[in-house]
């Protein structure tokens, strides 16, 4: 059973809203980290890269990424992805659920159930 988890994202994101509703409906204790309100600690990004790989964190499907000049989209590696994410948190797949044991990107009810034991 999860005592506390952290959900990262934007309050206005529909996927984040779905994740928050699921967590609330299933009685999962969590804190919410809003990228627009709080500055993301680079250590969190480093931890996510270490635990999940930068490709799992970096959102190539985001509007922000799609609107980048082609030259900026080329040659992305962990170092470049980290710098881009720290400059623009819209490049993080969201929401991010960190339970301490599980680290999930995006929202899928079955994955949340498995990660939280709910």
Task: Label each PLM-derived region with a short phrase.
Residues 35-118:
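Thiol/selenol-based redox catalytic cores and closely related redox-interacting motifs
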Residues 2-26, 30-35:
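Local sequence-structure signature of Cys/Sec-based thiol-disulfide redox active-site neighborhoods
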């Amino acid at each position: 059973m999860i005592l506390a988890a952290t959900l990262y994202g934007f309050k206005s994101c529909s996927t984040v809203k779905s994740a928050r509703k699921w967590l609330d409906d299933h009685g999962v204790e969590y804190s919410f980290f809003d990228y627009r309100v709080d500055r993301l600690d680079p250590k969190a990004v480093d931890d996510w890269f270490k635990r999940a790989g930068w490709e799992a964190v970096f959102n190539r499907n985001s509007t922000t990424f799609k609107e980048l000049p082609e030259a900026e989209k080329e040659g992305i590696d962990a170092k470049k992805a980290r710098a881009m994410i720290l400059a623009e948190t819209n490049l993080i797949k969201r929401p991010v659920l960190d339970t301490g044991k599980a680290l999930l990107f995006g929202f899928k009810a079955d994955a949340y159930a498995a990660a939280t034991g709910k």
